[in-house]
Curated annotation (Swiss-Prot):
Name of the molecule in the record: Small ribosomal subunit protein uS11
Similarity comment: Belongs to the universal ribosomal protein uS11 family.
Residue stretches spanning the membrane: none
Pfam family of the protein (one): Ribosomal_S11
UniProt keyword annotations, A-Z: Ribonucleoprotein, Ribosomal protein, RNA-binding, rRNA-binding
Single GO MF annotation: rRNA binding
Subunit structure, interactors included: Part of the 30S ribosomal subunit. Interacts with proteins S7 and S18. Binds to IF-3.
UniProt source species: Vibrio atlanticus (strain LGP32) (Vibrio splendidus (strain Mel32))
Gene3D superfamilies xrefs: Ribosomal protein S11 (3.30.420.80)
PROSITE patterns attached to this UniProt entry: RIBOSOMAL_S11
PANTHER family, per database record: 40S RIBOSOMAL PROTEIN S14/30S RIBOSOMAL PROTEIN S11
UniProt-listed GO biological process terms: translation
């Protein structure tokens, strides 16, 4: 007997009113992840994944483009309010927050969660150009 074709169910996106934008700004790249309050990832984007390669990945503009892409994906969940957590010393810290604000999100608060070592690992040697 022939198998009946099963219909692929359309995945229903859950509606989330407010979430958390995690920004990881390193010296080489910027990663933007938008999660719900429980920490489940809704959308993410990187400067490298946005078409920037090499040293252009580590620019504020690349971080801005990554934030805009991530914001567009997060809008599908009906997100309105964002809490921003910034981590890292990279050049895309401020431009990412500005881009999320310009994308139409209401930013409730900004937290700097940069890990500071209590004399942990030895830092990289100074550059000689």
């Amino acid at each position: 007997m022939a198998k009946q074709p099963t219909r692929a169910r359309k995945r229903v996106r859950k509606q989330v009113a407010d979430g958390v934008a995690h920004i990881h700004a390193s010296f080489n790249n910027t990663i933007v992840t938008i999660t719900d309050r429980q920490g489940n990832a809704l959308a993410w984007a990187t400067a490298g994944g946005s078409g920037f390669r090499g040293s252009r990945k580590s620019t504020p503009f690349a971080a801005q483009v990554a934030a805009e892409r991530c914001g567009e994906m997060a809008k599908e969940y009906g997100l309105k309010n964002l809490e921003v957590m910034v981590k890292g010393p990279g050049p895309g810290r401020e431009s990412t927050v500005r881009a999320l604000n310009a994308a139409g999100f209401r930013i409730t608060n900004i937290v700097d969660a940069t890990p500071i070592p209590h004399n942990g690992c030895r830092p990289p040697k100074k550059r000689r150009v």
